[in-house]
A protein has these predicted regions:
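Bimodal "functional hotspot" detector
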Residues: 1-106
Length: 106
């Protein structure tokens, strides 16, 4: 599952101008609890997202959409160095749960 998240970041999000210098070590862990995928990124990943011009909302929903379609889950939660961050200086509330948004996926 961790490998799948890494592939998503390198393939899908690379087209969005995702910051260089991130490695697979920036995905600290991925697990499923009940109907939720839990993704734990490094603090370095949080800093890279803050520093980039990346559309955080699109990133969150691209990852959510791919994970919900790939695994038998309904929700995704993101953590950075084990913590649920409210924001990364953007308009996304990272501390909450993300559900599949079929409108964004079209």
């Amino acid at each position: 599952m961790k490998r799948f998240v890494i592939l998503l970041l390198t393939a899908v999000l690379a087209t969005e101008g995702f910051p260089a210098g991130l490695t697979e070590d920036d995905v600290l862990g991925v697990a499923i609890a009940d109907d939720t995928v839990l993704v734990n990124f490094s603090a370095h990943m949080a800093d890279a997202i803050r520093a980039s011009r990346l559309n955080q909302r699109m990133m969150a929903y691209q990852l959510t959409g791919a994970l919900v379609q790939r695994y038998p889950v309904r929700r995704v939660r993101f953590f950075f160095d084990g913590e649920a961050k409210n924001t990364l200086d953007g308009d996304v509330m990272w501390a909450g749960e993300f559900l599949m948004d079929y409108v964004l996926c079209e």
